[in-house]
Amino acid sequence: MAPTPPSDTTRLRIATRESPLAMWQAEHVAKLLKKHGFQTEIVPLVSKGDTDMRPIDGTRQVGLFTKRIQQALVDDEADVAVHSLKDLPTEPDSRFVLAAVPPRESVLDALVFADNSPHLESQTGAESPLDYLPQGARVGTGSTRRLAQLKQLRPDLEVLPIRGNVQTRLAKLNAGEFDAIVLAHAGILRLEMTDLPHRLFPLDEMIPAPGQGALGIEVRSDDAGAMDAIANLNDAAARLAATAERKVLSELHGGCLAPIACHAKLETSNHGTELCLRAIVMSADGEQRLQEDARITVQPNDADLHVAEAHELGTLVAKRLRDKGADKLISTVRENH
């Protein structure tokens, strides 16, 4: 049954960061709610992650992009908080409920080139996006996960830190600071920037961050009205995949420092519907890589059981990675940052 829209005098206030991508995400959620008869108001805010331009791995802080948005819920400045799910800390906070994960966008990473880049003309029939780059090319990324996978694929690359929103990063790219930068494909699609010169990494080359491409919509745990309104936006497949991925990150206590990558998806097999998960832990230089794959059959028409199974799968994969030495690898990465 669809939730009952609030009265005409009530609006759902949606808190978000004020970057163009974050605003798009909030407006997207507002449109979804409008289809269900709800009125909304966007509340743009500035997070610490938007003003602190140090490399993320050097800040050693969790929730750079989310704490200010969550505080708006606590202070009753907003009823709903919209996050990029990959930015939302995995540690539970009893004040909030992840009320919905809407349908997921692309989970892929993209190698983006400068306008009129000569690199795209230098190769024909390249199998990998990195085949377009010359020896020693400069590639920008703000992610240790991407850094590690780039260095594994191409040890010769000079991988450099980059911060800022999509537009800021593109400006640095076109100013000649980099030969290419890595961006989430989901952001390119959401900002309707598909005309950017870019190539997509296949999943066997670049595994995404836990929750990449998904939105996480939070409400206060004591706000039943907002919870009911947002629950209608939940997509079961997206939530299950993100739950399994985030469980790996949580069990390994990875945070933003560790090069941990995960990808989960639902597949149909002779055994029924299965939730499949691949996760890796790497050294920052890409020389060491631990990988685990597992799958579990999920029962149809039982959302609570599905979530429990996703947690079980994530816990299993994390344990196997830990048995292979993941804790030591993660500790080494932290010590070196």
Swiss-Prot record:
At the top of the EC hierarchy, this enzyme's class is transferase
Checking InterPro entries in the record gives: HemC, Porphobilin_deaminase_cofac_BS, Porphobilin_deaminase_N, Porphobilinogen_deaminase_C, Porphobilinogen_deaminase_C_sf
Q: Which Gene3D superfamilies match?
A: Periplasmic binding protein-like II, Porphobilinogen deaminase, C-terminal domain
Q: Describe which pathway this protein belongs to, using the record's wording.
A: Porphyrin-containing compound metabolism; protoporphyrin-IX biosynthesis; coproporphyrinogen-III from 5-aminolevulinate: step 2/4
What would be an example GO MF term here? hydroxymethylbilane synthase activity
Any binding details for the cofactor?
Binds 1 dipyrromethane group covalently.
Post-translational modification S-(dipyrrolylmethanemethyl)cysteine, affected residues:
C256
| Documented EC number(s) | 2.5.1.61
Q: Which cofactor does it need?
A: dipyrromethane
| Catalysed reaction equations from the record | 4 porphobilinogen + H2O = hydroxymethylbilane + 4 NH4(+)
Q: Which GO terms describe its cellular component?
A: cytoplasm
One GO term (biological process): heme biosynthetic process
Instruction: Keywords in alphabetical order, please.
Output: Porphyrin biosynthesis, Transferase
Q: What does this protein do?
A: Tetrapolymerization of the monopyrrole PBG into the hydroxymethylbilane pre-uroporphyrinogen in several discrete steps.
Quaternary structure per UniProt?
Monomer.
Beyond the main fields, what else does the record say?
The porphobilinogen subunits are added to the dipyrromethane group.
Recorded family membership: Belongs to the HMBS family.
UniProt-recorded name of the protein: Porphobilinogen deaminase
Q: Whose protein is this, by species?
A: Rhodopirellula baltica (strain DSM 10527 / NCIMB 13988 / SH1)
Name the gene that codes for it: hemC
